Curated annotation (Swiss-Prot):
Classification via PANTHER family: SERINE--TRNA LIGASE (PTHR43697:SF1), SERYL-TRNA SYNTHETASE (PTHR43697)
Record: residues binding L-serine: T417, S418, E419, E472, S570
Organism: Plasmodium falciparum (isolate 3D7)
Highest taxon of source: Eukaryota
Protein name, entry field: Serine--tRNA ligase, cytoplasmic
Gene Ontology BP, a term: seryl-tRNA aminoacylation
Family membership noted in the UniProt record: Belongs to the class-II aminoacyl-tRNA synthetase family. Type-1 seryl-tRNA synthetase subfamily.
Subunit-level organization: Homodimer. The tRNA molecule binds across the dimer.
UniProt remark on domains: Consists of two distinct domains, a catalytic core and a N-terminal extension that is involved in tRNA binding.
Length: 618
């Protein structure tokens, strides 16, 4: 009976035991459950995470990491455990960009990459690199041989010095003994005389023993004198050998110094030639030769595209004409003749609209997407441009400051994008893994010569300027999570266009169009009504560890140091978005000569304090 009661109690208590082991669930805004398990059941927790990761794969894409961290911190569970969820996703893309190690292991892939990018003219760089690497290796082998020879000579000198000291000690000891023996010889005659005077037989025997001992010592002294001569000869030979070895060692040191200088110069040449090679493309990048080969991923608000063949929109004014119309038209006239082609000025409400756009973009990225706002320098060193991949390929597109001006003893340039300034803030840095990702947003003027694109329809107005405004986004991540944050950055850039209600499309660039430092690149193109085409307003690139290797930017996890991955994108190009707003938000005109009025987008009205901008004619 007692046993049956125990069994009955176990049956009742078993469900409570099972429920106590179930996860605690917290519901987030996206109706996705984040599961946080009791810390005591660590082993069971890991197995459960692996299984739930497959079921709830959307969790990674829908839940913001900072939100996860906030929840986990409230429940006394470290954010690193939530990061483990991200890290366990399968990464199909490459984790490594172009590097010297990659080149040595996969020279054929580097050749294929150049051909895929249409950069066959750089194949001679590969030949040069192989030659330089072989030459460097030969020099290193020769240097190592000389070092080994120097070590052998050093050990030989030590042995010679040790032996010399040994012989010197023997000589010093023999000299001391000789002086004692001479004293003994002086007393021999005295001892003989004493024996003659003594009549005691026992005393005579003792004296004879002393005489025999003294004679024996005298014989030893004569032998020591001969040994001293031999030791002196050995010492002389050792000194000669030591001098010869020192001369040889000095020559070896000079040869090693010369070889090491050659190795340093070869490394610089290898590095310079390696800089000419672009990043390795990911497999998903389509092959192509022209922009027509780009892959269109999706459209947004395609139905809102304004078609000029529609009678309602016959009187849309191009933005390049609008920016020439100022309220204070009696002050400004013939501006283009005074400032040159490729430059624009904005006055009053249009200038305010540009500032409103910048503020809206920065506030959105800082407040909604939790970026850190950084105002970075607009003048950088030459090496900074090498680190991010603008040099050596795009030197003719950069504005170089006069040779008389130096920055950190280097040539100085105006930045083509604030990406250069932001990333170089982390040069030679090691970041703790728990601080990743680092998300930065910056607004700056950007300077480009645009030598090949300064004329024609596609370069009018705000579409292509020598100086333009841009909001830049930078993510520094670890190698496992860069694809995840890359997708997020693209969504963050497109969010701005969605808030402005501007039609756009997302385009995956083909192998020819993909930027030099990128492994993959998506362009965000918005609709420009006056030209009836999409124009690029953002270019989002994942550079993998390509830039981080040049910057020597690493993150530390446990006992290992790995190169970071860098992601960049515009969030957005201010001038082009402004041009689209000036056309997209025009209030319909009944006739061509009617005053142009522009409706301010809803999200910008709080910055402008007005709903409509009126543009007057000159």
């Amino acid at each position: 009976m007692h046993l049956s009661k125990i069994i009955f109690l176990l049956i009742i208590l078993f469900p409570y035991h099972v429920n106590s082991r179930k996860p605690i669930k917290y519901k987030n805004v996206n109706n996705v459950f984040i599961e946080i398990y009791p810390c005591k059941a660590i082993k069971w927790e890991r197995k459960k995470k692996k299984r739930d990761l497959i079921k709830n794969n959307k969790l990674i894409h829908n839940v913001d990491v900072n939100y996860i961290n906030m929840i986990t911190n409230d429940n006394h569970i470290s954010s690193e455990k939530c990061r483990d969820i991200k890290k366990k996703r399968k990464i199909t893309s490459s984790e490594y960009g172009m590097s010297l190690e990659f080149f040595k292991k996969n020279p054929k892939k580097v050749v294929q990459n150049l051909k895929k990018r249409g950069m066959e003219k750089y194949l001679n760089v590969i030949v040069m690199l192989k030659k330089l690497i072989n030459e460097k290796n030969e020099n290193e082998v020769l240097r190592n041989k000389l070092r080994n020879r120097r070590k052998l000579l050093s050990d030989h000198i030590k042995n010679l010095i040790f032996n010399s000291k040994k012989y010197e000690d023997i000589i010093n000891r023999d000299i001391t003994n000789d002086s004692d023996h001479k004293t003994n010889l002086i007393h021999v005659d005295e001892e003989k005389k004493k024996t003659e005077k003594k009549n005691d037989t026992q005393d005579i025997l003792k004296d004879n023993q002393k005489i025999r001992y003294i004679n024996k010592e005298n014989q030893a002294t004569n032998n020591n004198i001969n040994n001293q001569d031999n030791s002196n000869d050995v010492l002389k030979k050792n000194k000669i050998q030591i001098e010869e070895i020192k001369k040889e060692t000095n020559q070896i040191n000079k040869d090693i110094d010369h070889i090491e200088m050659n190795i340093i110069n070869l490394k610089k040449k290898i590095e310079f030639n390696l800089y000419k090679l672009p990043n390795i493309l990911l497999n998903k990048v389509p092959k192509g030769k022209t922009t027509e080969d780009n892959k269109i991923i999706k459209f947004y608000k395609k139905e809102n595209i304004i078609q000029l063949n529609n009678e309602e929109y016959d009187f849309i004014e191009p933005h390049e004409e609008i920016i020439k119309k100022y309220e204070n038209n009696f002050i400004f006239s013939n501006i283009s003749n005074k400032i040159g082609f490729g430059y624009n000025i904005l006055v009053n409400d249009i200038a305010k609209l540009e500032r409103a756009l910048i503020d809206f973009m920065i506030n959105t990225h800082v407040n909604k997407f939790l970026y850190t706002y950084v105002k970075a320098p607009e003048i950088v060193t030459k090496s900074a441009l090498f680190n991010t991949g603008q040099l050596p390929k795009f030197e003719e597109d950069l504005f170089k400051i006069t040779d008389n001006y130096k920055l950190l003893n280097e040539d100085a340039y105006l930045i083509p994008t604030s990406e250069v300034s932001l990333l170089n803030l982390f040069k030679n840095s090691q970041i703790d893994y728990i601080h990743l990702p680092i998300k930065l947003v910056s607004h700056s003027s950007c300077f480009r010569t645009e030598k090949n694109n300064t004329y024609g329809k596609t370069s009018k107005g705000l579409l292509r300027e020598h100086i333009f405004q841009k909001v830049e986004l930078i993510n520094i991540t670890d190698k496992k999570t860069s694809p995840f944050y890359y997708k997020k950055l693209i969504k963050q850039s497109t969010y701005i266009l969605k808030q402005l209600n501007i039609p756009y499309r997302l385009v995956l660039l083909n192998s020819i169009e993909t930027p030099y430092s990128a492994s993959i690149c998506y362009d965000i193109e918005a609709w420009l009504p006056s030209q009836q085409r999409y124009v690029e307003v953002s270019s989002c690139s994942n550079c993998l560890d390509f830039q981080a290797r040049r910057l020597n930017l690493k993150y530390k996890i446990k006992d290992s140091n790995n190169f970071c991955h860098t992601i960049n994108g515009s969030g957005l190009a201010v001038g082009r978005v402004l041009a689209i707003i000036l056309e997209q938000y025009q209030i319909k005109k009944k006739h061509k000569n009617e005053i142009t009025k522009i409706q301010v987008p809803k999200v910008l009205r709080k910055y402008m304090n007005k709903d409509i901008i009126q543009v007057e004619y000159n």
